Amino acid sequence: MFSLQKKALQHIYMTPENASQLTKDLLQHLGLYWNGPVIKMDTVVHLHNKIFSNRSVLKYALAKQANITIIKTLVLWVEPEYALAQALKHNRKDVLECIFSYHLTTPKYHHIMHLTSSQELFEFFHLFICKSKNYNARMECLLYAATLYNFPNILEKNREYIIRHSIGNTLFAIACKERHIHLIAWFVTAGVLDTYDDSTLFNTAFRLGDYSLLEVACDLPIIYPDYLIISMMQTAIQKNYFRFFKKLLTHFNIYRQIIITDAAYYNRRKILLLLLNQNVFNNFAILCALSAAIKGHASKKTLNLLISQLDSQMTVIDSVYYSIIKYNNIDCIPLLMQIKTFRLETLVSIAVHGDNIDIIAACKAFLPKDTLYHLVLKMAIISRNHKLFKLYTEKENPMYIFTTIKAIISNLVNYTVVQAVAIEYLREFHREKQLPIVPLLMVLAEHNYITKFKKACYAANMSDQKVKRALIKCLFIASQKNYCQIFKYCFGSLLKVLSKHERVKFFNSVVFAKKLASYYDHQNMIHLIDSLIERFRYLIKD
């Protein structure tokens, strides 16, 4: 048999005429299983009037378990890398030995090591291609390759070496990167890691978007700290990995306000629905989430979902209002009005304080004009926002603005300092617009601003009948509210400008004012009126 093989090898390079000596039976016996003569012609093989590439011939020979002697010749016809790759695929150690004997100085072929499924062949192949003379370097190279190409048996075999040389963490990182699930589990449970960072596997799973890695991390026999799981859940929300989030939620059952808040901020309605269906979040947590949704300009569907979960009697927290204003989210206002406790008045007040013109303008569609102007001007006065005050007063009817400010002053009766500021705004506006003096006199008398009242009277035309009638009304106001100084000043001013005929009517008014004072039991006012009547009776009689 050997002589026949030798003869075949001698004639395998012969010309077609001489190669005809290789009969069909002989070729079959040698293990080639081809018909006709075999002739090598550069990069192809001529066989029975058919042309085959050298690679296909070698591949076919290996697949058919051809005789090693023939294969030794065929491997010379192809490049070494291809020959090695085919030998690895077919788990032919003898062919590898043959190739390495031909190529004593081989380049690095680490990239084809994974083609074999045999652990023994993998190690044997690595023995030849790793040229380092240092034992540790060779071992680390082998273990790196075993991790890279998923050969757990090699790692288990060298477990003590991995522990002794502290290379477990490096290899573990490779296993995570390559998504070798079984290897990852082995690294964590085999005790080969120096310091296992709980976040490594989770971070790798998120970075690669690999759900199977996340499952491995969850199923490992490790007790993870809550802060890590919360952090991973936040990452899942940010990346919108619903499957990842659901796995973490169902596996660890961790519910925190920050989770629902993040889901609302990033507009993750599917995740929000999953969280809300658990019925573990109270109204305050949902309101905080609503505030975050407004901050993140979430969709109307997300806002409606959160609003629908709120108790109708739950008071809207300030952060909701501040989020609308700070992040200028106008679109959410109509939706928030579904909440019974949502107050546009509060929103406008905060918007004025924050000088947010857009929000104030948006509220025009939902509030009556009187209410809106009352709120805006009131807050502009309180915050001394001259710019906003001017913006809302310069184009409006002056008397309408005057009446509005008058109402604001009346509402501030218990806030003396703020009321004084409002009075100053009113006087300044009155001066700029050159309005009639009478309404101003009435307001100053109503709120007992004696000094400003005297100044207004000094500027008024006291001979004007309207001014006279206004001062008489101020008498009644003063007697009703026990403003003795206002009464005394009005009394004296009127006596100076009234005619004899008018003084009689004036006396009747003073008598009526006394009756008002008696009705309200203002003893000081009664004594004052009596003394004034007694003192100036002669003027009335004349």
Swiss-Prot record:
This is Protein MGF 505-11L. It holds the Pfam family DUF249. Plays a role in virus cell tropism, and may be required for efficient virus replication in macrophages. InterPro entries: MGF_505. Keywords: Early protein. Induction: Expressed in the early phase of the viral replicative cycle. Belongs to the asfivirus MGF 505 family. It comes from African swine fever virus (strain Badajoz 1971 Vero-adapted) (Ba71V).
